[in-house]
Protein backbone atom coordinates (compact mmCIF):
# COMPACT_ATOMS: atom_id res chain seq x y z
CA UNK A 1 0.00 0.00 0.00
CA UNK A 2 1.25 3.48 -0.83
CA UNK A 3 1.05 5.62 2.31
CA UNK A 4 2.72 8.98 2.67
CA UNK A 5 2.46 10.72 6.02
CA UNK A 6 2.95 14.47 6.12
CA UNK A 7 2.35 17.06 8.81
CA UNK A 8 0.50 19.67 6.75
CA UNK A 9 -2.78 19.25 4.85
CA UNK A 10 -2.12 17.72 1.46
CA UNK A 11 -2.28 20.13 -1.47
CA UNK A 12 -2.94 19.45 -5.14
CA UNK A 13 -0.05 19.71 -7.59
CA UNK A 14 -0.90 19.38 -11.28
CA UNK A 15 2.55 18.18 -12.32
CA UNK A 16 2.60 15.57 -9.57
CA UNK A 17 -0.93 14.43 -10.41
CA UNK A 18 -0.05 13.99 -14.08
CA UNK A 19 2.92 11.84 -13.12
CA UNK A 20 0.77 9.83 -10.73
CA UNK A 21 -2.16 9.23 -13.07
CA UNK A 22 0.16 8.33 -15.92
CA UNK A 23 1.94 5.75 -13.76
CA UNK A 24 -1.24 4.42 -12.17
CA UNK A 25 -3.12 3.98 -15.45
CA UNK A 26 -0.15 2.05 -16.84
CA UNK A 27 0.09 -0.11 -13.71
CA UNK A 28 -3.57 -1.20 -13.87
CA UNK A 29 -3.78 -1.14 -17.69
CA UNK A 30 -6.48 1.53 -17.76
CA UNK A 31 -7.03 3.77 -20.82
CA UNK A 32 -5.45 7.22 -20.44
CA UNK A 33 -5.40 10.45 -22.43
CA UNK A 34 -2.92 13.11 -21.37
CA UNK A 35 -4.61 15.79 -23.47
CA UNK A 36 -8.05 15.11 -22.01
CA UNK A 37 -6.70 15.02 -18.47
CA UNK A 38 -4.82 18.30 -18.82
CA UNK A 39 -7.97 19.90 -20.23
CA UNK A 40 -10.04 18.72 -17.24
CA UNK A 41 -7.43 19.96 -14.76
CA UNK A 42 -7.35 23.33 -16.49
CA UNK A 43 -11.12 23.82 -16.69
CA UNK A 44 -11.65 22.91 -13.03
CA UNK A 45 -8.31 24.14 -11.70
CA UNK A 46 -9.83 26.00 -8.74
CA UNK A 47 -11.78 22.95 -7.59
CA UNK A 48 -8.81 20.61 -7.84
CA UNK A 49 -6.59 22.99 -5.89
CA UNK A 50 -9.15 23.91 -3.22
CA UNK A 51 -11.22 20.75 -2.88
CA UNK A 52 -10.56 17.09 -2.18
CA UNK A 53 -9.34 14.66 -4.85
CA UNK A 54 -9.69 10.87 -4.88
CA UNK A 55 -9.30 7.83 -7.13
CA UNK A 56 -11.94 5.26 -8.14
CA UNK A 57 -11.62 1.92 -9.98
CA UNK A 58 -13.45 -1.39 -10.35
CA UNK A 59 -12.18 -4.95 -10.16
CA UNK A 60 -12.79 -5.49 -13.89
CA UNK A 61 -9.59 -5.41 -15.99
CA UNK A 62 -9.71 -2.74 -18.68
CA UNK A 63 -12.28 -0.61 -16.86
CA UNK A 64 -11.76 3.11 -16.49
CA UNK A 65 -9.55 4.79 -13.95
CA UNK A 66 -11.66 7.59 -12.50
CA UNK A 67 -10.69 10.59 -10.44
CA UNK A 68 -12.98 13.03 -8.67
CA UNK A 69 -12.94 16.32 -6.89
CA UNK A 70 -15.28 17.13 -4.04
CA UNK A 71 -15.85 20.86 -3.83
CA UNK A 72 -15.90 22.63 -0.48
CA UNK A 73 -18.15 25.40 -1.79
CA UNK A 74 -21.13 25.83 -4.11
CA UNK A 75 -20.01 26.09 -7.75
CA UNK A 76 -21.80 25.79 -11.08
CA UNK A 77 -19.99 22.84 -12.64
CA UNK A 78 -22.50 22.67 -15.50
CA UNK A 79 -21.90 26.20 -16.77
CA UNK A 80 -18.15 25.74 -16.41
CA UNK A 81 -18.27 22.52 -18.45
CA UNK A 82 -20.59 23.94 -21.09
CA UNK A 83 -18.47 27.08 -21.55
CA UNK A 84 -15.35 24.96 -21.97
CA UNK A 85 -16.98 22.61 -24.46
CA UNK A 86 -16.89 19.61 -22.12
CA UNK A 87 -20.67 19.20 -22.44
CA UNK A 88 -22.64 19.39 -25.66
CA UNK A 89 -25.51 21.91 -25.71
CA UNK A 90 -27.98 19.01 -25.74
CA UNK A 91 -26.51 17.39 -22.62
CA UNK A 92 -26.11 20.74 -20.86
CA UNK A 93 -29.78 21.56 -21.53
CA UNK A 94 -31.11 18.21 -20.33
CA UNK A 95 -28.95 16.36 -17.81
CA UNK A 96 -27.12 19.57 -16.95
CA UNK A 97 -30.41 21.26 -16.10
CA UNK A 98 -31.23 18.39 -13.75
CA UNK A 99 -27.93 18.92 -11.91
CA UNK A 100 -28.65 22.65 -11.68
CA UNK A 101 -32.17 22.01 -10.42
CA UNK A 102 -30.91 19.85 -7.57
CA UNK A 103 -28.23 22.41 -6.77
CA UNK A 104 -30.84 25.14 -6.47
CA UNK A 105 -32.57 23.39 -3.55
CA UNK A 106 -32.09 24.66 0.00
CA UNK A 107 -31.35 28.25 -1.09
CA UNK A 108 -28.61 27.17 -3.48
CA UNK A 109 -26.36 25.73 -0.76
CA UNK A 110 -25.77 22.23 -2.26
CA UNK A 111 -22.24 21.64 -3.52
CA UNK A 112 -21.52 20.26 -6.99
CA UNK A 113 -18.53 18.04 -7.72
CA UNK A 114 -17.31 16.07 -10.74
CA UNK A 115 -16.05 12.64 -11.79
CA UNK A 116 -13.57 12.22 -14.62
CA UNK A 117 -12.49 9.26 -16.73
CA UNK A 118 -8.72 9.15 -17.29
CA UNK A 119 -9.36 8.70 -21.02
CA UNK A 120 -12.70 10.44 -21.68
CA UNK A 121 -12.59 13.36 -19.26
CA UNK A 122 -15.74 14.66 -17.55
CA UNK A 123 -18.32 11.90 -17.10
CA UNK A 124 -20.41 12.66 -14.01
CA UNK A 125 -21.63 15.47 -11.77
CA UNK A 126 -22.37 15.09 -8.06
CA UNK A 127 -24.58 17.17 -5.79
CA UNK A 128 -24.13 17.14 -2.00
CA UNK A 129 -27.23 18.46 -0.23
CA UNK A 130 -25.54 19.61 2.97
CA UNK A 131 -26.77 16.66 5.03
CA UNK A 132 -29.42 13.97 4.91
CA UNK A 133 -32.47 15.28 3.04
CA UNK A 134 -36.02 13.91 2.61
CA UNK A 135 -36.53 11.80 -0.49
CA UNK A 136 -39.66 13.86 -1.21
CA UNK A 137 -37.55 17.00 -1.65
CA UNK A 138 -35.08 15.35 -4.00
CA UNK A 139 -37.62 13.63 -6.24
CA UNK A 140 -39.88 16.69 -6.13
CA UNK A 141 -37.26 19.04 -7.56
CA UNK A 142 -38.07 20.71 -10.86
CA UNK A 143 -37.17 18.63 -13.89
CA UNK A 144 -36.78 15.27 -12.17
CA UNK A 145 -38.17 12.85 -14.77
CA UNK A 146 -41.05 10.52 -14.02
CA UNK A 147 -38.73 7.61 -14.83
CA UNK A 148 -36.91 8.45 -11.58
CA UNK A 149 -39.90 9.61 -9.52
CA UNK A 150 -41.83 6.41 -10.18
CA UNK A 151 -39.67 4.51 -7.66
CA UNK A 152 -40.55 6.72 -4.69
CA UNK A 153 -43.14 4.41 -3.14
CA UNK A 154 -40.90 1.36 -3.43
CA UNK A 155 -37.94 3.19 -1.89
CA UNK A 156 -40.02 4.30 1.07
CA UNK A 157 -41.37 0.80 1.61
CA UNK A 158 -37.75 -0.33 1.99
CA UNK A 159 -36.96 2.43 4.47
CA UNK A 160 -34.95 4.46 1.95
CA UNK A 161 -36.16 7.95 2.81
CA UNK A 162 -33.03 10.07 3.37
CA UNK A 163 -30.66 11.15 0.58
CA UNK A 164 -27.26 12.81 1.03
CA UNK A 165 -25.92 12.90 -2.56
CA UNK A 166 -27.15 12.47 -6.09
CA UNK A 167 -25.04 12.00 -9.20
CA UNK A 168 -25.81 12.37 -12.90
CA UNK A 169 -23.74 10.39 -15.40
CA UNK A 170 -23.55 12.37 -18.63
CA UNK A 171 -22.21 9.44 -20.67
CA UNK A 172 -24.38 6.59 -19.38
CA UNK A 173 -27.54 8.72 -19.03
CA UNK A 174 -28.15 7.56 -15.48
CA UNK A 175 -28.96 9.06 -12.09
CA UNK A 176 -27.56 7.80 -8.79
CA UNK A 177 -29.32 8.36 -5.47
CA UNK A 178 -27.21 7.85 -2.33
CA UNK A 179 -29.28 6.87 0.70
CA UNK A 180 -28.55 6.27 4.36
CA UNK A 181 -29.75 2.69 4.87
CA UNK A 182 -30.59 1.39 8.33
CA UNK A 183 -28.01 -0.95 9.83
CA UNK A 184 -26.99 -3.49 10.73
CA UNK A 185 -27.52 -5.06 7.34
CA UNK A 186 -29.51 -8.29 7.27
CA UNK A 187 -29.67 -10.88 4.54
CA UNK A 188 -33.38 -10.11 4.12
CA UNK A 189 -32.58 -6.42 3.64
CA UNK A 190 -29.80 -7.16 1.14
CA UNK A 191 -32.08 -9.51 -0.79
CA UNK A 192 -34.79 -6.84 -1.03
CA UNK A 193 -32.31 -4.14 -2.00
CA UNK A 194 -30.72 -6.31 -4.71
CA UNK A 195 -34.17 -7.11 -6.09
CA UNK A 196 -34.54 -3.42 -6.98
CA UNK A 197 -32.04 -4.06 -9.77
CA UNK A 198 -33.27 -7.55 -10.61
CA UNK A 199 -30.15 -9.01 -9.01
CA UNK A 200 -29.76 -12.23 -7.06
CA UNK A 201 -29.08 -12.00 -3.32
CA UNK A 202 -25.43 -11.66 -2.34
CA UNK A 203 -23.51 -14.89 -1.95
CA UNK A 204 -22.80 -16.13 1.54
CA UNK A 205 -19.20 -14.95 1.37
CA UNK A 206 -20.23 -11.54 0.03
CA UNK A 207 -22.83 -11.07 2.72
CA UNK A 208 -20.44 -12.05 5.50
CA UNK A 209 -18.01 -9.36 4.34
CA UNK A 210 -20.77 -6.80 3.86
CA UNK A 211 -22.08 -7.43 7.37
CA UNK A 212 -18.59 -7.12 8.81
CA UNK A 213 -17.61 -3.87 7.11
CA UNK A 214 -20.85 -1.91 6.61
CA UNK A 215 -21.51 0.39 9.56
CA UNK A 216 -23.95 -1.25 11.97
CA UNK A 217 -25.79 2.01 12.68
CA UNK A 218 -26.37 2.91 9.03
CA UNK A 219 -24.48 2.80 5.76
CA UNK A 220 -24.42 4.38 2.31
CA UNK A 221 -26.60 2.56 -0.21
CA UNK A 222 -26.97 3.69 -3.82
CA UNK A 223 -29.28 2.99 -6.73
CA UNK A 224 -28.48 3.69 -10.39
CA UNK A 225 -31.50 4.56 -12.55
CA UNK A 226 -31.53 4.71 -16.35
CA UNK A 227 -33.21 8.01 -17.16
CA UNK A 228 -34.73 6.85 -20.45
CA UNK A 229 -36.12 3.47 -19.37
CA UNK A 230 -36.55 4.08 -15.65
CA UNK A 231 -34.88 0.75 -14.94
CA UNK A 232 -32.77 0.44 -11.80
CA UNK A 233 -29.60 -0.92 -13.34
CA UNK A 234 -27.46 -1.38 -10.24
CA UNK A 235 -27.43 -1.07 -6.47
CA UNK A 236 -24.33 -0.54 -4.36
CA UNK A 237 -23.29 -0.91 -0.72
CA UNK A 238 -20.44 1.31 0.50
CA UNK A 239 -17.97 0.48 3.25
CA UNK A 240 -16.25 3.84 3.67
CA UNK A 241 -12.87 4.10 5.40
CA UNK A 242 -11.69 0.55 5.78
CA UNK A 243 -9.52 -0.12 8.84
CA UNK A 244 -5.75 -0.21 8.50
CA UNK A 245 -4.96 -3.36 6.56
CA UNK A 246 -2.14 -4.21 8.95
CA UNK A 247 -4.63 -4.23 11.82
CA UNK A 248 -7.58 -6.02 10.19
CA UNK A 249 -8.04 -8.13 7.11
CA UNK A 250 -9.84 -6.30 4.31
CA UNK A 251 -12.69 -7.67 2.19
CA UNK A 252 -11.48 -9.96 -0.58
CA UNK A 253 -10.20 -8.07 -3.64
CA UNK A 254 -8.87 -9.51 -6.89
CA UNK A 255 -5.50 -9.00 -8.58
CA UNK A 256 -6.74 -5.93 -10.45
CA UNK A 257 -7.61 -4.13 -7.23
CA UNK A 258 -4.45 -5.35 -5.51
CA UNK A 259 -2.44 -3.57 -8.20
CA UNK A 260 -4.48 -0.44 -7.65
CA UNK A 261 -3.86 -0.63 -3.90
CA UNK A 262 -0.15 -1.09 -4.57
CA UNK A 263 0.28 1.79 -7.01
CA UNK A 264 -2.37 4.43 -6.17
CA UNK A 265 -0.71 7.17 -4.10
CA UNK A 266 -2.41 9.04 -1.28
CA UNK A 267 -0.94 12.21 0.20
CA UNK A 268 -3.59 12.76 2.86
CA UNK A 269 -2.50 12.69 6.48
CA UNK A 270 -5.12 9.99 7.08
CA UNK A 271 -5.65 7.67 4.13
CA UNK A 272 -9.19 6.71 3.16
CA UNK A 273 -9.82 3.38 1.44
CA UNK A 274 -13.36 2.33 0.58
CA UNK A 275 -14.92 -0.71 -1.02
CA UNK A 276 -18.37 -0.97 -2.59
CA UNK A 277 -20.24 -4.10 -3.65
CA UNK A 278 -22.28 -3.47 -6.81
CA UNK A 279 -25.11 -5.75 -7.96
CA UNK A 280 -27.17 -5.72 -11.14
CA UNK A 281 -29.18 -8.11 -13.27
CA UNK A 282 -26.19 -8.74 -15.52
CA UNK A 283 -23.26 -7.10 -13.73
CA UNK A 284 -21.80 -7.74 -10.32
CA UNK A 285 -18.49 -6.18 -9.41
CA UNK A 286 -16.48 -4.46 -6.68
CA UNK A 287 -15.49 -0.79 -6.67
CA UNK A 288 -12.58 0.66 -4.75
CA UNK A 289 -11.90 4.29 -3.84
CA UNK A 290 -8.82 5.89 -2.29
CA UNK A 291 -8.10 9.40 -1.11
CA UNK A 292 -5.48 11.30 -3.12
CA UNK A 293 -5.10 14.78 -1.63
CA UNK A 294 -7.02 17.56 0.08
CA UNK A 295 -7.86 15.62 3.28
CA UNK A 296 -10.89 13.49 2.45
CA UNK A 297 -11.54 12.05 5.92
CA UNK A 298 -12.32 15.38 7.64
CA UNK A 299 -14.60 16.31 4.74
CA UNK A 300 -16.75 13.18 4.83
CA UNK A 301 -16.87 13.25 8.63
CA UNK A 302 -18.25 16.75 8.30
CA UNK A 303 -20.98 15.33 6.09
CA UNK A 304 -22.02 13.00 8.91
CA UNK A 305 -21.02 9.96 6.87
CA UNK A 306 -21.06 6.67 8.76
CA UNK A 307 -17.67 4.99 8.42
CA UNK A 308 -16.39 1.44 8.72
CA UNK A 309 -13.58 2.32 11.12
Curated annotation (Swiss-Prot):
Q: What does this protein do?
A: Prenyltransferase that attaches isoprenoid moieties to carbon atoms of aromatic substrates in an enzyme-catalyzed Friedel-Crafts reaction. Shows specificity for dimethylallyl diphosphate (DMAPP) and does not accept geranyl diphosphate (GPP) or isopentenyl diphosphate (IPP). Prenylates the artificial substrate 2,7-dihydroxynaphthalene (2,7-DHN), as well as dihydrophenazine-1-carboxylic acid and 4-hydroxybenzoic acid at lower levels.
Which protein, by its recorded name, is this? Aromatic prenyltransferase
| Pfam families referenced in this protein's UniProt entry, alphabetically | PTase_Orf2 (PF11468)
User: So what EC number does this one have?
Assistant: 2.5.1.-
| Family, per entry | Belongs to the aromatic prenyltransferase family.
Instruction: Give the main EC class.
Output: transferase
Further notes on this entry? The gene is not located within a recognizable secondary metabolic gene cluster.
Q: Which gene encodes it?
A: ptf
Looking up InterPro entries in the UniProt record yields:
Aro_prenylTrfase, Prenyltransferase_CloQ, PrenylTrfase-like_sf
Q: Which GO terms describe its molecular function?
A: prenyltransferase activity
Species name for this entry? Sclerotinia sclerotiorum (strain ATCC 18683 / 1980 / Ss-1) (White mold)
